[in-house]
Amino acid sequence: MYVVYILYSEKLNKFYTGFTSNFDLRLYFHFNSENRKFTHNASDWTLYLKMECESKNQAMLIEKHIKKMKSKIYIQNLIKYPEIIDSLCLKYKNC
């Protein structure tokens, strides 16, 4: 199973969006790895959103869609309006 996830840092007031097939391991690397690029700038990252996807391709396309929006408001609206997540899953269902 693939997961699209969004982390939030209050210190930076920034979101990080990614996807993975091993969520627990990926989160571990975000918090503990020496090779972190973006998430090393803060130590207060929290899980903001986690979406389960049907395939790797669906997860990649949803991640790309969210990043392309370049909007904190859009990401906040994913929580505020769960139907947006449903529509993304449907839009990229058979990709």
What are these language model-derived features?
Residues M1-R36, H40-K50, M60-K67, L78-C95:
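GIY-YIG nuclease catalytic motif and its immediate N-terminal context
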Residues K56:
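C2H2-type zinc-finger recognition helix
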Residues M69-S71:
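A common structural junction motif
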Residues Y74:
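Conserved donor-nucleotide binding/catalytic region of nucleotide-linked donor-dependent transferases
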Residues C53:
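Short, surface-exposed polybasic/aromatic micro-patch for ligand or macromolecular engagement
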